[in-house]
UniProtKB/Swiss-Prot annotation:
Any single Pfam family the record assigns to this protein: PPR_2
Composition skew (Polar residues), residue ranges: 60-72
Protein name according to UniProt: Pentatricopeptide repeat-containing protein At2g39230, mitochondrial
Chain positions of PPR repeats: 168-202, 203-237, 238-272, 273-307, 309-343, 344-378, 379-413, 414-444, 448-482, 483-517, 518-552, 553-588, 589-623, 624-658, 659-693, 694-728, 729-763, 764-798, 799-833
Top-rank taxon, per record: Eukaryota
Cellular component, GO annotation: mitochondrion
Transit peptide boundaries: 1-49
Assigned protein family: Belongs to the PPR family. P subfamily.
Tissue note: Expressed in lateral organ junctions and shoot apical meristem (SAM).
Subcellular location as annotated: Mitochondrion
Organism for this UniProt entry: Arabidopsis thaliana (Mouse-ear cress)
Keywords from the UniProt entry: Mitochondrion, Repeat, Transit peptide
Length: 867
C-alpha cells in the first residue's frame, strides 16, 4: 500500500517549488494531459461509482504528449506529478476527476496515498461532485478493510493542511457514511467518536443509520451512548432518531422509557409523524397506560387528519384484551372498522382468546364466523385458540369440528395442538377419537417418538388401559418400537387398576423382547403387589431381580421397605433397613425411615417409632416435616399430648414449619381431651400461617364441642365451614344431628338431614342409629307434632324427617288412623320417606346409642367403615 508520508513523493527542491507554484518550468509541460475533447457530462446519481467516469470516447493522446503507452503512463507517472496537475485543476473538480481516471486506474487510486486524498478534497469543493467523493470513499473503505478510522481521519486532516484545502464537516460525514455502506459498524462508531472529539457536527441521517444498525443488533447501550454524544454537541436528531430510540427501549422491554422519550420530544415542540405516534401508542399499550393510548389515537387523528394504522389499532385492542377489558377492546375494534380499516387476524385472534378466557365461547364463535364472512382467513393461531378452548370446556364435538376445518384449509396443526386434542378426547371418554387423531397426525408426520411417549402416558395416567394397549399395537405397526419407558407406564397403569396379573404379563412380554428392566420397572411391580396386600408375589419379583444379578438401587429398597410397612411387616422393614446400612453401607434416605415410623404409629407402637427416629438422627439423616407429623399423630392418638407438644418444639428448633396434618393431629388430640381452648387456639393460628383448615379439622372441633354439649359453638363452626367453602361430609352431618337432637333442636337437625339428602350423601348405619335414638323419645314426638302443626299453619312444607318422627310416634301410641293420614299427606306433597329410618322408628327397635366419644373417633372413612 502506498504510504501517506509526503516526503517520499517529492523530489526536492525543484518539485517543492512546483507545489508552491504549479506552473511548469518550461513552456512544454512534462505531465500527461487528457484529450481536450473529453466529455465532462457527469451524472449526479449517488449510486454511480467512479469507474463509470472513465472516458467513453478515449482517443489517442494529444500530439504534444510524449509517445508513451497507457501502461507506461500508469507505471511511470509518479504521484507528485499527478498531484501537481490536480492542484492546478482544483477549481475544476470534473476536469480533475477526468484526469485521474485517465492517468491512474481506479484500483490503484483506491489504494490510498496523497493523490486519493487531494482528489477527495477537490471533489468536496463542488456540490456537483459530492456524490463522486462519497462513492470514492465507499470504495476506498472496501479496498482497505483493515485501515482503522483514526488513520483515515488523520490522513484526511493532514492532507487538507498540507495542500491548502478547507476541511468541512461533509468530509468526515462522507467517511462515516463509507463505513456504514460497507457495514463496518464498529469502525462507524469509532469514526463518530473521532468526529465528536473534533466538534464536527454529524449529518443526522448518517447517525440514524448507525443507530438503526446498533438497535437491530441489540447493541442498545452503544446506541444510547452515541445519541448522548450527539446531544452534547447540540444535535437533537429528527423524528427518525426518536423512533430509533423508542424502538431501542421497546426492545429492552422498557416501554416506560419509550413513553418518556416521546413526551420529551413533544415538550420541545416537535411535530411527530404517523410512525412516531404509532410507536408511542405501542409503548403506552405495553406500559400499560391505555388512557394515554386512546388519547394518542385521538391526537393523531386531530394533528395528522387521518386515523391510526391497522397495526396501531391492533396494539390497542390486544392491550385491552390483556387487561380483561373486552368491552373497550370491542369498541376500539368497531372504531377501527368504522374508519374503513379492516380487522386484522391478530386483533381478531386476541378478541377470540379474550372471549374464551371469559368463558364466552358463543361470542368467540360469533366473531370467528364474522371474520370469515368479511373474507379474513383464520390462521393457525386462530384455529389453535378455538380448538384449545373447546377442549378445555370439554366441548369436544366443536373441538373436532374446528380441528377438521383447520386441516381442510391445509393448515397443519402443531404437535402441541394434537396433544391437546388427544388429551381432551381422553377426558371426554373418547379413546377411539384420540387414537384416530393420533393416526392422522402420524400420517401427516406431525407425530414423532417423543409425542408418542407423551400420548401413551396420557392413556396410562387416565386409566385407559385398553386404549393404551391399542395404541401400543398401532405404534408397532407403524414401525415404532416401544422402549422400557412405555412398558413401565403400561405396568403402572395396570397396577393402579389392581390388575396385577396383567402387569406381570406385560413385564414378561418386555423380557421376551429383550428389553432390560430398570429400577423403575422393578419398583412399579413390587409396589403394586404390596399395595394389593400380595406380599408373596412381591417377594417373587424381588427374588427374580436378585437371580438376574440386577444391582438394585435406593429407589427399589425404599419401595420394599415402604411395602413391608403397608402390609404390617414394619419390624421386618426395620431389620432390612439396618442390614442395608450395616452390610451394604447404603445411606438410606429419609423416606425409608418415615415409612417405618409411620408403620409403627399405625399399629400404635409409638415407642418403636421414637426409637427409629433416634436411629435416624444417629445415622446422620435429618428428619423432615413428614417425620414429625407421623410422630405427632402417633402421640396424639395414644393420648400423649405432652410428647406431641415436645415434638412441635423440636420441629420449630430445626426451623421446620408444622403442616396441616400436624396441626390437625394436635387439634384432634386436644379435642379428645376436652381441651377445647387449646384446640381452638391452634385452629386460629392456621390462617396466620397461610394454612386452610380442611373438613377433618372442622370435624374434630365440632365433635369436641358436641361432646361438651356446646352446640352453639358447634353451629358457629358449621356456618364458618360453609362460608369458607369447605364441603361437609357424612361425619360432619352425623355429629351435628346427634348433638342437635340431644340438645332438643329437632328443627335444625331436620334441616341438616334434608340438606344431607339434597347433596346426595347416603346415610350409613351410624347416622340411622343417631336418628332413631334421638327421635324415638316421648319428648321429641310431642315437640315434632307441635312443630308440624305450626308449619302447616304457616303454609310451610315440613321435611321428611319431621313427618317420619310424628308418624312413628302416632304408630307407637296406637293412633294408626292419624299415622296413615299423615303418611298419605306426606306422599301427596311429593315427599319420599327414608325407608330405613321410617321402619326403625315404627318398629320401635331402638339400639343403644353409641357413645359420643365413639362417634367422634370415626373421622376417617377407614375407621367409620370398620365400626
Amino acid at each position: 500500500m502506498t504510504t501517506f508520508m509526503v516526503s517520499k513523493r517529492f523530489r526536492p527542491p525543484i518539485f517543492l517549488h512546483r507545489f508552491i507554484n504549479p506552473k511548469p518550468i518550461s513552456s512544454q509541460t512534462r505531465f500527461l494531459h487528457p484529450p481536450d475533447n473529453q466529455s465532462r457530462d457527469i451524472s449526479d446519481s449517488t449510486t454511480e461509482t467512479i469507474s463509470t467516469l472513465e472516458f467513453p470516447h478515449k482517443t489517442s493522446v494529444p500530439n504534444h504528449s510524449p509517445l508513451t503507452s497507457t501502461s507506461e503512463t500508469e507505471n511511470h507517472v509518479d504521484d507528485a506529478r499527478v498531484i501537481e496537475v490536480l492542484l492546478g485543476r482544483r477549481n475544476d473538480p470534473v476536469s480533475a476527476l477526468q484526469y485521474c481516471n485517465w492517468v491512474k486506474p481506479l484500483h490503484r487510486l483506491c489504494e490510498g496515498g496523497d493523490v486519493f486524498w487531494v482528489l477527495i478534497h477537490i471533489l468536496l469543493s463542488s456540490i456537483h461532485t459530492h456524490d463522486r467523493a462519497s462513492n470514492l470513499l465507499v470504495m476506498f473503505v472496501s479496498n482497505n478493510p483493515t485501515l482503522i478510522p483514526n488513520v483515515m481521519v488523520n490522513n484526511l486532516v493532514d492532507s487538507s493542511k498540507r495542500f491548502g484545502f478547507e476541511l468541512t464537516p461533509r468530509a468526515f460525514n462522507y467517511l462515516l457514511n463509507a463505513y456504514i455502506r460497507n457495514k463496518r459498524m464498529d469502525y462507524a462508531v469509532d469514526c463518530f467518536g473521532l468526529m465528536v472529539d473534533r466538534k464536527v457536527v454529524p449529518f443526522v441521517p448518517y447517525v440514524n443509520n448507525v443507530l438503526s444498525s446498533l438497535v437491530r443488533s441489540n447493541l442498545i447501550d452503544e446506541a444510547k451512548e452515541i445519541y448522548n454524544k450527539m446531544v452534547l454537541i447540540g444535535v437533537a436528531g429528527d423524528n427518525v432518531t426518536t423512533q430509533l430510540l423508542m424502538r431501542a427501549s421497546l426492545r429492552e422491554r422498557k416501554p416506560e422509557e419509550a413513553v418518556k422519550i416521546f413526551r420529551r420530544v413533544m415538550s420541545r415542540g416537535a411535530e411527530p409523524d404517523g410512525l412516531l405516534f404509532s410507536l408511542a401508542v405501542q409503548a403506552a399499550c405495553k406500559t400499560p397506560d391505555l388512557v394515554m393510548a386512546l388519547d394518542l389515537l385521538r391526537e393523531m387523528r386531530g394533528k395528522l387528519g387521518v386515523p391510526a394504522s391497522q397495526e396501531t389499532y391492533t396494539s390497542v385492542i390486544v392491550a385491552f384484551v390483556k387487561e380483561g377489558n373486552m368491552e373497550e377492546a370491542v369498541r376500539v375494534m368497531d372504531e377501527m372498522v368504522g374508519f374503513g380499516i379492516p380487522m386484522s387476524v391478530i386483533a381478531a385472534t386476541s378478541l377470540v382468546n379474550g372471549y374464551c378466557k371469559g368463558n364466552e365461547l358463543g361470542k368467540a364463535l360469533d366473531l370467528f364466523n364474522r371474520m370469515e364472512e368479511e373474507g379474513l382467513a383464520p390462521d393457525k393461531v386462530m384455529f389453535s385458540v378455538m380448538v384449545e378452548w373447546f377442549c378445555k370446556n370439554m366441548e369436544m364435538e366443536k373441538a373436532i369440528e374446528f380441528y377438521m376445518r383447520m386441516k381442510s384449509v391445509r393448515i397443519a396443526p402443531s404437535s402441541v395442538l394434537v396433544h391437546t386434542m388427544i388429551q381432551g378426547c381422553l377426558k371426554a371418554e373418547s379413546p377411539e377419537a384420540a387414537l384416530e387423531i393420533f393416526n392422522d397426525s402420524f400420517e401427516s408426520w406431525i407425530a414423532h417418538g417423543f409425542m408418542c411417549n407423551k400420548i401413551f402416558l396420557l392413556f396410562c395416567k387416565q386409566g385407559k388401559v385398553d386404549a393404551a394397549t391399542s395404541f401400543l399395537k398401532m405404534m408397532e405397526q407403524k414401525g415404532i418400537e416401544p422402549n422400557v419407558v412405555f412398558y413401565n407406564n403400561m405396568m403402572l397403569a395396570h397396577c393402579r387398576m389392581k390388575n396385577m396379573d396383567l402387569a406381570r404379563s406385560i413385564f414378561s412380554e418386555m423380557l421376551e423382547k429383550g428389553l432390560e428392566p430398570n429400577n423403575f420397572t422393578y419398583s412399579i411391580l413390587i409396589d403394586g403387589f404390596f399395595k394389593n396386600k400380595d406380599e408373596q408375589n412381591a417377594w417373587d419379583v424381588i427374588n427374580q431381580m436378585n437371580a438376574s444379578n440386577f444391582e438394585a438401587n435406593e429407589v427399589i429398597y425404599n419401595t420394599i421397605i415402604n411395602g413391608l410397612c403397608k402390609v404390617g411387616q414394619t419390624s421386618k422393614a426395620k431389620e432390612m433397613l439396618q442390614n442395608l446400612i450395616k452390610e451394604k453401607r447404603y445411606s438410606m434416605s429419609c423416606t425409608s425411615y418415615n415409612s417405618i415410623i409411620d408403620g409403627f404409629v399405625k399399629v400404635g407402637d409409638t415407642d418403636s417409632a421414637v426409637e427409629t427416629y433416634r436411629e435416624m438422627s444417629e445415622n446422620g439423616k435429618s428428619p423432615n416435616v413428614v417425620t414429625f407429623t407421623s410422630l405427632i399423630n402417633g402421640f396424639c392418638k395414644s393420648n400423649r399430648m405432652d410428647l406431641a407438644l415436645e415434638m412441635t418444639h423440636e420441629m420449630k428448633s430445626m426451623e421446620l414449619k408444622l403442616d396441616l396434618p400436624a396441626y390437625g393431629a394436635l387439634i384432634d388430640g386436644f379435642c379428645k381431651k376436652n381441651d377445647m381452648k387449646t384446640a381452638y387456639t391452634l385452629f386460629s393460628e392456621l390462617p396466620e400461617l397461610g394454612l386452610m383448615p380442611n373438613v377433618s379439622v372442622y370435624n374434630s372441633l365440632i365433635s369436641g364441642f358436641r361432646n361438651l354439649g356446646k352446640m352453639d359453638a358447634a353451629i358457629d363452626l358449621y356456618k364458618k365451614m360453609v362460608n369458607d367453602g369447605i364441603s361437609c361430609d357424612l361425619f360432619t352431618y352425623t355429629t351435628m344431628i346427634d348433638g342437635l337432637l340431644k340438645d332438643g333442636n329437632i328443627n335444625l337437625a331436620s334441616d341438616l338431614y334434608s340438606e344431607l339428602l339434597d347433596l346426595g350423601i347416603v346415610p350409613d348405619e351410624i347416622l340411622h342409629m343417631v336418628l332413631v335414638n334421638g327421635l324415638s323419645k316421648k319428648g321429641q314426638f310431642l315437640k315434632a307434632s307441635k312443630m308440624l302443626e305450626e308449619m302447616k299453619k304457616k303454609d310451610v312444607t315440613p321435611n321428611v324427617l319431621l313427618y317420619s318422627t310424628v308418624i312413628a310416634g302416632h304408630h307407637r301410641e296406637g293412633n294408626l288412623n292419624e299415622a296413615f293420614r299423615l303418611h298419605d299427606e306426606m306422599l301427596e306433597k311429593g315427599i319420599v320417606h327414608d325407608d330405613t329410618v321410617f321402619n326403625l322408628l315404627v318398629s320401635g327397635r331402638v339400639e343403644k346409642p353409641p357413645a359420643a366419644s365413639k362417634i367422634s373417633s370415626l373421622a376417617s372413612p377407614e375407621m367409620r367403615s370398620s365400626y
